[in-house]
Amino acid sequence: MLQPKRTKFRKQFKGRIHGTAKGGTNLDFGGFGLKALEPNRVTAREIEAARRAITREMKRAGRVWIRIFPDLPVTSKPTEVRMGKGKGAVDYWAARVKPGRIMFEIDGVSEETAREALRLGAAKLSVRTRFVQRIAE
């Protein structure tokens, strides 16, 4: 699963996800993509599950680009532990996703295959998404 090799600090504040995506809103690599329609945190497990579903449907043909990276450490305290005594240990890594962000791109397959692959991948994610494709020039 994806996670940073090293970070400046082990733990981060929770933060809020305001506004729409400033960058990463256009298809830069592939011909088809999956665009987020709502703000949310997407975990590294979700990203990996979606990647597997997409590559399986594409039958190893074409190419997949993951445009988001889980760089936010999410902490949790063990069960039945009283409040206080510091912040919990890092439980998993997540990526903050804003509306308009392209999360996955694929190329080298037909539109029907791309549509079905991204539909299966979107089912693994905790955000509503839309299928997008490059405008023929």
Swiss-Prot record:
Q: Which GO terms describe its molecular function?
A: rRNA binding; structural constituent of ribosome; tRNA binding
Which Pfam family, an example, fits this chain?
Ribosomal_L16
UniProt keywords, alphabetically: Ribonucleoprotein, Ribosomal protein, RNA-binding, rRNA-binding, tRNA-binding
Asked whether the keyword Ribosomal protein is assigned, the reply is yes
- Which cysteines share a disulfide bond? none
Q: What does UniProt give as GO cellular component? A: cytosolic large ribosomal subunit
GO-annotated biological processes: translation
Q: Which InterPro entries match?
A: Ribosomal_uL16, Ribosomal_uL16_bact-type, Ribosomal_uL16_CS, Ribosomal_uL16_dom, Ribosomal_uL16_sf
Q: What SUPFAM superfamilies is this protein classified in?
A: Ribosomal protein L16p/L10e
Primary role? Binds 23S rRNA and is also seen to make contacts with the A and possibly P site tRNAs.
Return the similarity comment.
Answer: Belongs to the universal ribosomal protein uL16 family.
PANTHER family according to UniProt: 50S/60S RIBOSOMAL PROTEIN L16, LARGE RIBOSOMAL SUBUNIT PROTEIN UL16M
Q: How does it assemble?
A: Part of the 50S ribosomal subunit.
Its name, as the record gives it, is Large ribosomal subunit protein uL16
Source organism per entry reads Mesorhizobium japonicum (strain LMG 29417 / CECT 9101 / MAFF 303099) (Mesorhizobium loti (strain MAFF 303099))
